Design a protein with these regions (language model features):
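A ligand-binding cleft/hinge motif common to bilobed small-molecule-binding domains
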Residues: 97, 111-122, 167-174, 195-230
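Ligand-binding clefts/hinges and TM-proximal coupling segments of bilobed small-molecule sensing domains
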Residues: 23-27, 163-182, 220-222, 253-294
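Extracytoplasmic small-molecule ligand-binding "clamshell" domains
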Residues: 24-109
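Beta->alpha turn/N-cap motifs
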Residues: 46-50, 91-96, 105-117, 141, ...
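Extended ligand-binding regions for polar small-molecule ligands
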Residues: 23-27, 71-76, 149, 154-155, ...
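Bilobed "Venus flytrap"/periplasmic-binding protein-like clamshell domains
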Residues: 43, 49-52, 62-79, 115, ...
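Periplasmic-binding protein-like
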Residues: 48, 131-139, 206, 214-253, ...
């Protein structure tokens, strides 16, 4: 399910000629492409442990499904600027600091596990959709937690700075569930909180939960449960008011998805053994979510 653009089809047709000209034009002054051209370097934000989207492998190389999108965008920038030897600098970011670091110019864009929603669009711009997730629960298999209603009076962990944290706090307040919500610094810390017994469930995007389960010492001891509290679209994040760079990113994403490359990336990262431990996530997409790859 590709994220729909707000413009109507008629408006899109009316703008198409102008956009084509913008794509061929030199980088606009003050734009991201202008900054990259002047500095001779593109700075890419990445996650450290968002398996299998953006994370370090056992060689400390940044890899993942979303990182493949980042790499494709970098290649498109090199081609656009005619700079095949453009320096590429990678900067680790977190759920908490990704938006401030983007806004202050520390990095130019990121493709990771960032949800594109109305609230974040006030602070940053987003590419078209690269993945669709549902927010669910990871819990011990065979336990009492089967859905969100079972969390009443229980300790639940969630990663700080995420949309899941907002949703969980809202659910707790509106349903008067008296949950003790633990906000962990990253997904790995969230799972360790669950694994240690300090929480009965870990709420997060289902694909990220599958990644944490795959990394566990005994993956079969854990299961993903619960009706999704939201369906969320991941997009690559860039600074606001930069239509030229956004178009380059969207065009690159469209090419990857229509060529079938995105399908290959999904199979590579979600249905086959992946580094660093050669674990297989065995993650399947619903028909609706599968449309985000096409």
């Amino acid at each position: 399910m590709q994220l729909r653009k707000p413009a109507t089809a008629i408006l899109a047709l009316a703008l198409s000629a102008g956009l084509a000209q913008a794509d061929d034009a030199a980088p606009a002054a003050g734009s991201t492409l202008d900054k990259i051209a002047k500095n001779g370097v593109i700075v890419v934000g990445h996650r450290e442990s968002s398996v299998p989207f953006s994370y370090y492998d056992n060689q400390q190389k940044v890899v993942g499904y979303s990182q493949d999108y980042s790499n494709a965008i970098v290649e498109a920038v090199k081609k656009k600027l005619n700079k095949p030897d453009l320096q590429v600098k990678l900067i680790p970011i977190t759920s908490q600091n990704r938006i401030p670091l983007l806004q202050n110019g520390t990095f130019d864009f990121e493709c990771g596990s960032t949800t594109n929603n109305v609230e974040r669009q006030k602070q940053a711009a987003f590419s078209d959709t690269i993945f669709v997730v549902g927010t669910r629960l990871l819990t011990k298999k065979g336990g009492d937690i089967k859905d969100f209603a079972n969390l009443k009076d229980k300790a639940v962990v969630v990663t700080s700075g995420t949309t899941s944290e907002v949703l969980l706090n809202k659910l707790n307040e509106e349903q008067k569930m008296n949950m003790r919500i633990i906000s962990a610094k990253d997904h790995g810390d969230s799972f360790r909180t669950l694994e240690s017994g300090r929480a009965v469930a870990f709420m997060m995007d289902d694909a990220l939960l599958a990644g944490e389960r795959a990394k566990a010492k005994k993956p079969d001891n854990w299961e993903i449960v619960g009706k999704p509290q939201s369906q969320e679209a991941y997009g690559c994040m860039l600074r606001k008011d930069d239509p030229q760079f956004k178009k380059l990113m969207d065009d690159t994403i469209a090419q990857v998805q229509t060529s079938g490359e995105a399908e290959k990336w999904f199979d590579k990262w979600f249905k086959n053994p992946i580094p660093p431990k050669n674990l297989n996530m065995n993650f399947e997409l619903s028909d609706e979510k599968h449309c985000s790859l096409n």
